[in-house]
Amino acid sequence: MPLGSDAAAAARNFATKLFNATKFALMNGAGVAALPNREELSDADRWILDRAEEIRAKVDAYLDDYQFAKANELLYHFTWDELCDWYLEIAKTQIPRDGMSEQGRNTQIVLGRVLDVVLRLLHPTMPFVTEAVSYTHLTLPTTPY
């Protein structure tokens, strides 16, 4: 299947978006840790965790049926439209710059967890990108699946 310059540019833009989202998260203290109790999370934190779980289940089903295009499209839209365009913007207001509140720490944990899920789900089709993004910062290369 030939790839045109538009498809290559779209793939580059997505990889850049993923890299920048991860960079933002790590610069703001996000990391993979045990999730706090659900009652302690903000509405936005609960929403993105629920959506990430829905996406994970759908992507798993698509991959089990060898429907790679559907899995990738779902991940693309979740990552770009929901995680980056919505949740990251909300997270910017929940993670304070001048001190750490409990809600700010919870948002860091949720952001780290959701990024870890996204990188794991993207890994089968974008292994070089996901390893480059997570190798030095997150747990993808060293944790079992």
Model-derived segments and their meaning:
Residues 6-11, 97-118:
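Short secondary-structure subsegments characteristic of cysteine-rich extracellular domains
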Residues 38-48, 103:
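A ubiquitous short alpha-helical element
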Residues 13-24, 47-54, 73-93:
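Core structural elements
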Residues 30-34, 91, 95, 99, ...:
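Structured alpha-helical bundle/scaffold domains in large eukaryotic membrane-trafficking regulators
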Residues 136-142:
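Conserved small/polar residues in nucleotide/adenosyl-binding loops
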Residues 1-39:
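Catalytic adenosine-cofactor/nucleotide-binding cores of aminoacyl-tRNA synthetases and other
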Residues 52-70:
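Long, non-coiled-coil amphipathic alpha-helical linker/lever segments
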